[in-house]
Amino acid sequence: MASPPAHRSSKAADEELPKASSTFHPSLWGSFFLTYQPPTAPQRANMEERAEVLRERVRKVLKGSTTDQLPETVNLILTLQRLGLGYYYENEIDKLLHQIYSNSDYNEKDLNLVSQRFYLLRKNGYDVPSDVFLSFKTEEGGFACAAADTRSLLSLYNAAHLRKHGEEVLDEAISSTRLRLQDLLGRLLPESPFAKEVSSSLRTPLFRRVGILEARNYIPIYEKEATRNEAVLELAKLNFNLQQLDFCEELKHCSAWWNEMIAKSKLTFVRDRIVEEYFWMNGACYDPPYSLSRIILTKITGLITIIDDMFDTHGTTEDCMKFAEAFGRWDESAIHLLPEYMKDFYILMLETFQSFEDALGPEKSYRVLYLKQAMERLVELYSKEIKWRDDDYVPTMSEHLQVSAETIATIALTCSAYAGMGDMSITKETFEWALSFPQFNYKNFWFICTALQRCRIDQA
């Protein structure tokens, strides 16, 4: 939650319009996505047909790859994943990864190959020991890498960021290579593809990047590589454009839902950030099968934004407590508990959750029940923070961490993502695990988010 609201109690005369006000700037997007017009059906069909031809052509290349040509095979898999194409070849890639992991017969003196192999395997869940880099250490504490071998230096830097606690060799690799890359960047042509790669890695290491953005940024870099595969390049461009069409359709739907929500509920004080929220959620699940997850995530984030603004900047304490009481009932009959300005929103919220059940169908609609439980927990903790404020209570560090780790809505967003996934491996046990608030998962996530936010504030 943000700063404390201005009022702690409600009066009958002010029931319909609380005194607190907001200062949020309006949306930068206006009706841009509402007026989006997709290509015609024949145009879309032609794009899909060409993409399928290219997918099979690339599949043949992938199936022809072996560990006998390890550098080429590792580079191909890395390229496909960076270009956002890995989803289409999961089975082929998994088979090759197992072979790469099992095959210890490769040039262990090739720093670029060792780094790329390490990065690829660790990124895909294989427990590769970091001592493969020990042989490259120098007596001075750096890493043996020829001045001209800049590619190996960059590969080592990205690989080292997949470190685990206590892996000193990777800690040292990051410190050493960062300094050398920073020095190197000043001597490269700013517009060269490699300079852009170095700059991007120094800003955000490869494995931390949002996949769909990485695909967009890497396409023009890959296009200039002498060893590029033309089928891979064409497919990457076409696939990205097809995904953009889907994203625009989803944003059009979410924008229409949001505009209707705000117009009917008359909650003009809330932040209008539906486009930014979709962009945020898209980063979590951008692959083609997860359209419903993206939509549910975006709508839930929109609802959380409204509730957060009610509790933080607009509603009185009494109003918020009434809302919290009505929230857990999930029934229209509870609107008599609410102040007038909350009633329409409450009904529209119920309709939104019903639309989730309708979209999921009879076999998966049970997932919405768990999503409701996650939202109930979130509102309960928002109320707890308000009580702390009104009572001038200073929580202990332990109490603060426990509550704030949940009020960033990780549980609600996790359940939202799971709810929209068609994969039948998502079961009731999956949701029960998420709702159990696994400490290693959410608390670490909260700590990382908070630390990164503090770093950005310090840098500003």
Curated annotation (Swiss-Prot):
Q: How is the cofactor bound?
A: Binds 3 Mg(2+) or Mn(2+) ions per subunit.
Required co-factor(s) are: Mg(2+); Mn(2+)
Copy the pathway line from the protein's UniProt record: Secondary metabolite biosynthesis; terpenoid biosynthesis
One of the Pfam families matching this protein, by short name = Terpene_synth
Main localization of the protein described in the UniProt heading: cytoplasm
Which residues does Mg(2+) 1 bind?
308, 312
Swiss-Prot/TrEMBL keywords: Cytoplasm, Magnesium, Manganese, Metal-binding
Please give a single GO biological process term from the UniProt record.
diterpenoid biosynthetic process
One of the record's GO molecular function terms: magnesium ion binding
Superkingdom classification of source:
Eukaryota
Q: Where found, per UniProt?
A: Cytoplasm
Gene Ontology CC terms:
cytoplasm
Give me the residues that bind Mg(2+) 2, please: 308, 312
What is the role of the protein in this entry?
Non-functional sesquiterpene synthase due to a frameshift removing part of the catalytic site.
Domain remark in the UniProt entry: The Asp-Asp-Xaa-Xaa-Asp/Glu (DDXXD/E) motif is important for the catalytic activity, presumably through binding to Mg(2+).
Which family does the record claim for this protein?
A: Belongs to the terpene synthase family.
Q: What else is known?
A: The allele found in cv. B73 encodes an active enzyme while the allele found in cv. Delprim contains a frame shift mutation.
Subunit annotation: Monomer.
Q: What is this protein called?
A: Inactive 7-epi-sesquithujene synthase
> Which organism is this entry from?
Zea mays (Maize)
